Structures are given as C-alpha cells and as structure tokens.
C-alpha cells in the first residue's frame, strides 16, 4: 500500500497538501481541475433529491470521464470496499463485470445493456477507476473511445491524474459523497456525440 501512496503522490491525482500552486484551475471546492485542454467540456451532476453538486462529467470529442469524490477514514482506504459494492450492484443489473489491474491499480471493466431514447437497448462499456488519497477516494467512470484508443485513453488518464483534491476538515462518514461547489462563471455542458 505504501508504494501505491507514493505513486499517487508523484503521478496524481493529488491532495491539495501535495501541490504548491493552484493557479489556473477551475475550482469546484473539493475538486480542482487544472485548465488542461480547451477541447474538454465540463458538465456538473446534481443529486436528484438534494440538488447538491456531487460529480463532474468531463468530455472530449469522443470520450467521457465522470468523477466523484468520497470521504474515507483517516488511516485506511475504501476503494477495495467500493469495488465490491459496485460489483454487486452492477451484477444485480445483469452487467458483465471484470476486475482487472490497470493504470490505477484494481479497476472494473463493465459491459451492460442501457436503454435508448427510442425504447431499445444498447451495450455500453464502462471502465471504473479509483484512487485513495488522504481521507478521500476519487472515483472515475470512463466511456467512449478512451476504452479502446490508446491516445484517447492516455488523455483521459492525464485529466484524471491532474485533479487536485481539497477534501476539507469536515467529519463525514466513510464512502459519503463529498459535495462540490460551483465556480464563478459559466460551465458549458458537453456536446453530444454525433
């Protein structure tokens, strides 16, 4: 586990305590996104019941990365536990779930049927990644060409690794979504693939 912590601290995603500068970032409070790519659009995701901001969807022309931040205990990690819960949930929806070792350690590759607007279904593939940090877990779900195109995969992974987390000091139960805040200005919704 120590090697994973050192690797994360060197390669990202980063804890705010590990970075010396927060210039040129889009500040969502607990998640700070360096302004890396003009072709990257950002959409905020709100919790349906509470309307609080809980996730960000980052989209290139051909791929999407959705990121969520979860609280974790001070002296332990939660990604393994989250993987088990996520696997059970997805399998209960008849998804095919494969646990693999990838760029971020243990990951899930998922194939599942999702409904289309016309009532038919389509096979969607999703890659779930997660990185434990000090008192936090950053989870990402990747769809689109980044699942098969190495250049696109590298770009999406670079975006995920560039995120800076400012978890704050508020006590939260383990695996609780850490709420985000809107930055000043407008955030354009991602363009729909054609």
Predicted regions and their residues:
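Short, solvent-exposed recognition patches
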Residues: 69, 73-95
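Short glycine/proline-enriched loop/turn "hinge" motifs that connect secondary-structure elements
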Residues: 57-59, 128-135
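Signature of long, low-cysteine stretches enriched in small and polar/charged residues
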Residues: 85-132, 185
């Amino acid at each position: 586990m120590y090697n994973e912590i050192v690797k994360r601290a060197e390669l990202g995603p980063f804890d705010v305590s590990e970075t010396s500068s927060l210039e040129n970032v889009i500040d969502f409070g607990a998640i700070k996104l360096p302004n890396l790519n003009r072709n990257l659009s950002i959409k905020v995701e709100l919790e349906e019941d509470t309307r609080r901001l809980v996730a960000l969807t980052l989209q290139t022309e051909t791929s999407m990365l959705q990121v969520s931040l979860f609280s974790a205990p001070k002296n332990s990690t939660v990604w393994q536990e989250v993987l088990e819960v996520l696997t059970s949930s997805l399998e209960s929806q008849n998804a095919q779930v494969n646990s693999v070792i990838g760029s971020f350690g243990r990951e899930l590759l998922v194939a599942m049927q999702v409904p289309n607007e016309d009532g038919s279904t389509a096979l969607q593939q999703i890659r779930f990644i997660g990185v434990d940090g000090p008192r936090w877990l950053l989870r990402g779900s990747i769809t689109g060409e980044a699942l098969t195109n190495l250049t696109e995969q590298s770009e999406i992974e670079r975006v995920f690794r560039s995120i800076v987390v400012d978890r704050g000091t508020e006590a939260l139960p383990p695996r609780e979504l850490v709420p985000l805040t809107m930055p000043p200005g407008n955030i354009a919704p991602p363009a729909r693939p054609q």
